[in-house]
Amino acid sequence: MNRILLTLLTLTLLAGCQRVAVEETKLVPPAVEKTVLNVGTIYGSQIYVTTGQGEAGFDYEMASRFADHLELELAMKPYSNIKELYQALNSGEVDLIAAGLADTPTRRENFRLGPPLYRVNQVLVYKQGTPQPKDISQLKDEITVITDSSFVDTLSQLQKIYPELVWDQEQDKDNEELLAMIARGEISYTIADSTTFEISRRYMPELRAGLTLKEKQAIVWLLPAQNSDKLMSELLTFWHGEKLDGTLAHLDEKYFAHVKRFDYVDTRAFLRAIDNKLPKYKERFQYYAGDLDWRKLAATAYQESHWNPNARSPTGVRGLMMLTLPTAKQMGIENRLDAEQSIKGGAKYLRGILNRLPDSIPDNQRMWFALASYNIGYGHVEDARKLAESMGLNPSAWRDLKEVLPLLQKRKYYKQTRYGYARGNEAVHYVDNIRRYYDTLVWIDNQNKLLEENQALIEESQLADQIGIGEKAITGAQPE
């Protein structure tokens, strides 16, 4: 009996020992948390530039703020041309493109487009002294544009109306290079957006705008066509916030408003003065500027005296920085006609104004308030700020103050103020002029640095070649 029970128990246990399929557990690595916003861009005055003062540009500033909104670090990645930008976005090298690109049907087919940042016109550009184009159909093969640009889309649409219209495309050049080729007379026509044209003619005053080919075209950011829903949602939320709090309007004023006014004679004279006069005073501007950007100090001096140390005004101001006698005494300046003393006094006075300004004025706008004060007096600027506040405007935003300053010339408004009448309209033009001069100095400074870097590379390459030839001579090898 016991033997039977033992046998049954053994059989039961054996039956329970069937092979069990154990499913292999696959360990899924945790998702890597994103820490950087990679933004593809191209170099351009209003898009993205690197200077001794750091990175700048409309698209850069917006991208920096968007990265802050996402609580990510920003990495700007400049590419050589638009084709490379597209490839980088499609391959995932960058999360979005912020490069001053326009909204076009072709881009809508291939990417997701963000909301409009600002709007531009497309203009046909030619050189002063050559015939002004009257009709696009007459140009035939004389137009050169950038490959993959919005201008190719525009010309393709026009070609349906004018079948004989043809054009050349350049892949390895940017729009500013083509504009420089126009200025040198190397090509006849190109197309540029109105902001790039307006900025570039400050350095190349020979440029002229002919026909307007497209109006009010939106400048947008590009996102991948797939898997970008979350990023697009964040971008739209961010854009609405920036629009409501005035950031978009501020950046538009900062980068574009002051370049719309253009004076060919003044621009040519300034470029000549940079070559002929500035070298005499550059080191002094750099020294006495201290923590200020010396180029803003130099631009102010040019606006005041055209860098003439003996300049005099019927109102009593004198010297390179055109100081009044009381201001000179206050700054410890004995001789206003001495260039070094004048620069020292002007820098000290300007720095003093900056220190007096209310903390509510943002750092990136304080200089414009200070320059307006330098021109018409601190009290009048304070009057304008109070007027702005009474009108429901922001007294600490330059874009609002420049609208109010001209009102100081109207009795209806200046009778409400403490300091009375002032030529506020002149103060606005004064600041705009200095900003244009400053932008030109920055551009030329950057060009000179690029030339120096290229020259250093050439010399390094030549030295390497000489060393290689020397080594071959020592070993007895024949140079190739």
Swiss-Prot record:
It is a peripheral membrane protein. Residues 16-259 are annotated as: Non-LT domain. One of its GO terms (molecular function) is peptidoglycan lytic transglycosylase activity. The active site is at E304. GO terms for biological process: cell wall macromolecule catabolic process; cell wall organization; peptidoglycan catabolic process. It is found in: Cell outer membrane. Disulfide bonds: none annotated. The keyword Iron does not apply. Residues 1-15 form the signal peptide. Keywords: Cell outer membrane, Cell wall biogenesis/degradation, Lyase, Membrane, Signal. It catalyses: Exolytic cleavage of the (1->4)-beta-glycosidic linkage between N-acetylmuramic acid (MurNAc) and N-acetylglucosamine (GlcNAc) residues in peptidoglycan, from either the reducing or the non-reducing ends of the peptidoglycan chains, with concomitant formation of a 1,6-anhydrobond in the MurNAc residue. It is an enzyme of class 4 (lyase). One of its GO terms (cellular component) is cell outer membrane. PROSITE patterns: PROKAR_LIPOPROTEIN. CDD domains: MLTF-like, PBP2_YfhD_N. Residues 260-480 are annotated as: LT domain. Its EC number is 4.2.2.n1. InterPro entries: Lysozyme-like_dom_sf, MltF, Solute-binding_3/MltF_N, Transglycosylase_SLT_dom_1. Murein-degrading enzyme that degrades murein glycan strands and insoluble, high-molecular weight murein sacculi, with the concomitant formation of a 1,6-anhydromuramoyl product. Lytic transglycosylases (LTs) play an integral role in the metabolism of the peptidoglycan (PG) sacculus. Their lytic action creates space within the PG sacculus to allow for its expansion as well as for the insertion of various structures such as secretion systems and flagella. The N-terminal domain does not have lytic activity and probably modulates enzymatic activity. The C-terminal domain is the catalytic active domain. PANTHER family: MEMBRANE-BOUND LYTIC MUREIN TRANSGLYCOSYLASE F. In the N-terminal section; belongs to the bacterial solute-binding protein 3 family. This is Membrane-bound lytic murein transglycosylase F. It comes from Shewanella woodyi (strain ATCC 51908 / MS32).
